[in-house]
C-alpha cells in the first residue's frame, strides 16, 4: 500500500478531526472517559481547537493511502531544542501495520531538520501498551503526574537525537 505524509491544509482539518475522534475513541472506551468526566480528552475536541492550533503555527501532518487519510499528528515547538508531539492517531482498522512507526519516524526526521534534538509526549500513564510502544521506538519515560481534574495519571516520555 503506497502512503504519503503531507502537511495538512486548513480545508482538510475536518477529515483530520474525524481520524482523531475515531482513533482516540478507542482510548476513551478503554479507560471509561466521557465528555462528563474528561471533557478535554482528545476524543472530544472540536474543530475550532484544530483551527486555533493551526493558526498558532502548529505543524500538522496527515498520513494518506491513495486519497484517503488514515493518520494524523502534529508538532509544536517548545524551545530551540524541544518539540512536543500531539495527537498521533491511526484509524483503528489500520493499526498494527507499521503506520504509527512511519509517522513517528517522520516526526523525528522533521524535528531534526528543524534543528531540534528532542521530542516530548504526554500519554495516559496507565496505557502500558502505548507506553511500551514509545519506549520500543526510542523514547524514555521521564515521569508521571496525577492531576485532580483528570481520571487518569499523565505520563511523560521523550526522545533525543
Predicted region positions:
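Conserved acetyl-CoA pyrophosphate-binding loop and the N-cap/start of the following alpha-helix
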Residues: 94, 98-106
